[in-house]
Amino acid sequence: MKDRQDYYYWKAKKEGYRSRAAYKLLQMNRTFKLIREGDLVLDLGATPGGWSQVAALLGARVVAVDINPMKPLENVTFIRGDITLPETLEKIREISPDYDVVMSDASPKISGKWTIDHLRSIDLARASFSIAKEVLKPGGNFVVKVFQGEEIQKFFNELKPHFRFKKFHSPQASRKRSAEVYFIGKRFRKI
């Protein structure tokens, strides 16, 4: 159930964003300069489209991917597919072989069991990074959500060598009780 007292929920409704998550990307982009006008952005786990909407409004061309349907957005091409399957990567590459930014706010179905939810979030983040390694341009940027837990440092260490700048970040728009953090990787290098 949506928290009807949630400031960002109401702000998103008032300002026409598809979800409160739009403010997370806006805040991260303001801090880290992830998306520039003219960039080609790949949004994995995109539905309902808050991040795709922000990227398009920033002047990027966006390819959005999700297992669930998404209502159309201007300057956004949608692919319905599972990011863990190779055929989805093929569809992504049919549109473009390389992208300036790969981002993922994908979240697993929450079971209520912390360890399971954490591990599922790491699996989704790894699937996102697996795609990013294939399509992200050298010098490109990568953002992915993970839930904090015992595997987070191992995951960070896996990504670390691929980026000149890397850190975990929790935007102000994240709920205070949320265990989500975002890995920010800038200036990608293929190794």
UniProtKB/Swiss-Prot annotation:
<keyword id="KW-0963">Cytoplasm</keyword>
<feature type="binding site">
    <location>
        <position position="49"/>
    </location>
    <ligand>
        <name>S-adenosyl-L-methionine</name>
    </ligand>
</feature>
<feature type="binding site">
    <location>
        <position position="82"/>
    </location>
    <ligand>
        <name>S-adenosyl-L-methionine</name>
    </ligand>
</feature>
<dbReference type="Pfam" id="PF01728">
    <property type="entry name" value="FtsJ"/>
</dbReference>
<dbReference type="InterPro" id="IPR002877">
    <property type="entry name" value="RNA_MeTrfase_FtsJ_dom"/>
</dbReference>
<feature type="binding site">
    <location>
        <position position="66"/>
    </location>
    <ligand>
        <name>S-adenosyl-L-methionine</name>
    </ligand>
</feature>
<feature type="binding site">
    <location>
        <position position="51"/>
    </location>
    <ligand>
        <name>S-adenosyl-L-methionine</name>
    </ligand>
</feature>
<keyword id="KW-0489">Methyltransferase</keyword>
<dbReference type="GO" id="GO:0005737">
    <property type="term" value="C:cytoplasm"/>
</dbReference>
<keyword id="KW-0808">Transferase</keyword>
<comment type="similarity">
    <text>Belongs to the class I-like SAM-binding methyltransferase superfamily. RNA methyltransferase RlmE family.</text>
</comment>
<protein>
    <recommendedName>
        <fullName>Ribosomal RNA large subunit methyltransferase E</fullName>
        <ecNumber>2.1.1.166</ecNumber>
    </recommendedName>
</protein>
<dbReference type="GO" id="GO:0008650">
    <property type="term" value="F:rRNA (uridine-2'-O-)-methyltransferase activity"/>
</dbReference>
<dbReference type="InterPro" id="IPR029063">
    <property type="entry name" value="SAM-dependent_MTases_sf"/>
</dbReference>
<keyword id="KW-0698">rRNA processing</keyword>
<feature type="binding site">
    <location>
        <position position="105"/>
    </location>
    <ligand>
        <name>S-adenosyl-L-methionine</name>
    </ligand>
</feature>
<feature type="active site" description="Proton acceptor">
    <location>
        <position position="145"/>
    </location>
</feature>
<dbReference type="InterPro" id="IPR015507">
    <property type="entry name" value="rRNA-MeTfrase_E"/>
</dbReference>
<comment type="function">
    <text>Specifically methylates the uridine in position 2552 of 23S rRNA at the 2'-O position of the ribose in the fully assembled 50S ribosomal subunit.</text>
</comment>
<keyword id="KW-0949">S-adenosyl-L-methionine</keyword>
<dbReference type="InterPro" id="IPR050082">
    <property type="entry name" value="RNA_methyltr_RlmE"/>
</dbReference>
